[in-house]
A protein has these predicted regions:
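Conserved NTP-binding catalytic cores of kinases and kinase-like/nucleotidyltransferase enzymes
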Residues: 1-83, 198-201, 306-315
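ATP-binding pocket architecture of kinase catalytic cores
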Residues: 43-135
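A glycine-centered beta->alpha junction motif in the catalytic cores
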Residues: 97-111, 147, 151-152, 269-285
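A cross-family kinase active-site recognition segment
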Residues: 110-161, 181-183, 213, 289
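Active-site activation/catalytic loop segments of kinase-like enzymes and analogous catalytic loops
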Residues: 217-251, 266-283
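All-alpha amphipathic helical-bundle segments outside canonical DNA-binding/catalytic cores
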Residues: 252-264
Length: 315
């Protein structure tokens, strides 16, 4: 997805700053709703990804880059931005952060057992990284940001049945989850287009912009929401492989297992809430305006392997 057009002079400047060959061709890359991504082909045959951050400030991006260095150093495969002149990993252009990333030549995660198991292993490895004190605790894809939707609906008089249901669910949340669930570094948005895999192996985990300190098991159910369904149908084998890989590195506690149904419920609602905000409150009048309903409809489907049973609401 591209929101910001590439200025050839700026592209040439960042390539020069990274010590790269001149630009030969540029092509927009699909995927992502918060930034613009381009594939750059250089005159020496090298390929790089140019990422332009449309919704994050340069200060936020700079912090994220330090997170990526830490995560990659612990064996989680993720592209780290190239170093530029002066030691920075980004260039500020018209108030936006631009950065160059290594190009990983692999397709999106297909959902085969081996890849799902490997993804589970990598998630557990991520969850085992010690917090260095620089990660935020607000989960921008979770329930933490629901109050912002309510404030906007109140200010603009745009309340809807869906938002009212979210409001009611948020009030119930503290009584539904056990206290003291293990917390740590989570990715927060592990959907298939954020995972590159081939030959049964994850080659790269992408887009850590929602990385934060949160409930670890919530990351596991989000990965199932994003990678464990096929044509609107939950695939039990994908969950089994994901969990098997995860627990080969880190065992879930009994409290975490017991919390999985509620974590799944609220994670699914959170994805729906993100889509509602994006396509009903920010980018309106598109073919995606009802996309949030694809998530709420999933809540009507029982998942015995997760211990989840539908309870109605949020429709």
């Amino acid at each position: 997805m591209a929101y910001t057009e590439v200025d050839p002079e700026a592209a040439a400047a960042i390539l020069k700053s990274a010590g790269c060959a001149p630009l030969s061709a540029v092509q927009s890359i699909s995927g992502g709703w918060a930034n613009s991504n381009y594939l750059l082909e250089l005159e020496d045959g090298e390929r790089l990804v140019l990422k332009i951050w449309d919704e994050r400030s340069p200060k936020e991006v700079n912090r994220l880059n330090s997170h990526l260095e830490l995560i990659a150093s612990h064996g989680v495969p993720t592209p780290v931005p190239l170093l530029l002149e002066g030691g920075s990993r980004m260039l500020e252009v018209d108030g936006r952060a631009w950065m160059l990333l290594p190009f990983v030549d692999a397709p999106w995660l297909a959902g085969d057992r081996s890849s799902m198991k490997h993804l589970g292993e990598l998630m557990a490895r991520l969850h085992s990284i010690p917090d260095d004190g620089t990660f935020i605790s607000e989960y921008t894809m979770g329930t933490d940001v629901w109050p912002e939707l309510f404030e906007r609906a109140e200010a603009e008089n745009t309340w809807s049945p869906f938002l009212r249901e979210l409001e009611a669910e948020l009030a119930r949340l503290p009584n539904l989850l056990p206290a003291g669930l293990p917390r740590g570094i989570i990715h927060g948005d592990l959907f298939q287009d954020n995972v590159l895999a081939s030959d049964g192996e994850v080659k790269a985990v992408l887009d850590f912009e929602d990385v934060c300190i949160n409930v670890l098991a919530s990351d596991l159910v989000v990965a199932f929401i994003g990678c464990g369904w096929e044509d609107g149908v939950p695939v039990e084998e994908r969950w089994t492989a994901l969990l098997e890989g995860y627990e080969s590195v880190r065992q879930l506690s009994e409290n975490e297992r017991a919390a999985l149904p509620e974590l799944y419920y609220y994670a699914t609602l959170s994805v729906a809430a993100w889509r509602y905000r994006k396509f009903r409150m920010e980018v309106t009048g598109t073919e995606h305006s009802d996309r949030y309903k694809l998530m709420t409809e999933r809540l009507d489907i029982p998942l015995p392997f997760l211990g989840y049973q539908p309870r109605g609401g949020a429709r």
